[in-house]
């Protein structure tokens, strides 16, 4: 039996990180170095599924109609279509260039079906839990 391999739509979704940001060009350059086109996501697209925003074939467009205020969630970088080596390269490039984006995620078979707003909320919960555990251990 042959495994069905879904085509990958490489991209870097960027939430709440304006192109006027001083390190925007460094972000774009780092993504281009590993073959990822940068796709800024507007607050009116927060109800669309992550898969649809990435251009994954067969992904449903929107699960909810939603318009988020940019201050609802901090900046996020959501990556699709990278192997481990390219992911490590990208993260090192971002660190070297001084690009700081608080939330980062890789698209998975599960989260590609979520609305962007749900993924952002989950990333914030995870970040808060990590901070809580770190504070508890100090």
Model-derived features: positions:
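Iron-sulfur (Fe-S) cluster-binding modules
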Residues: 1, 136-138
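Residue-level signal for the start and early helices of compact helical domains
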Residues: 3, 44, 68, 73, ...
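Helix-rich interaction surfaces within compact, conserved domain-sized segments
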Residues: 12, 26, 33, 39, ...
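Short, solvent-exposed interaction modules
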Residues: 62-96
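Cofactor- and metal-binding active-site motifs of prokaryotic enzymes
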Residues: 49-58, 64-71, 86, 116-121
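Residue-level detector of functional hotspots within protein domains
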Residues: 22-24, 63-68, 105
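N-terminal, charge-rich interaction modules
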Residues: 1-57
């Amino acid at each position: 039996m042959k495994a069905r391999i879904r085509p990958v739509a490489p991209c870097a979704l960027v939430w709440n990180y304006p192109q006027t940001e001083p390190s925007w060009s460094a972000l774009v350059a780092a993504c281009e170095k590993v073959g990822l086109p940068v796709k800024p996501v507007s607050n009116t697209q927060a109800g669309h599924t992550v898969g649809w925003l990435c251009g994954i074939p067969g992904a449903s467009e929107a699960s909810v109609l939603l318009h988020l205020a940019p201050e609802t969630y901090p900046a996020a970088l959501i990556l699709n279509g990278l192997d481990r080596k390219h992911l490590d390269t990208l993260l090192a490039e971002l660190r070297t260039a001084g690009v700081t984006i608080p939330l980062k995620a890789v698209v998975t078979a599960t989260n590609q079906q979520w609305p962007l707003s749900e993924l952002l909320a989950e990333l914030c919960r995870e970040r808060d839990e990590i901070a809580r555990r770190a504070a508890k251990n100090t």
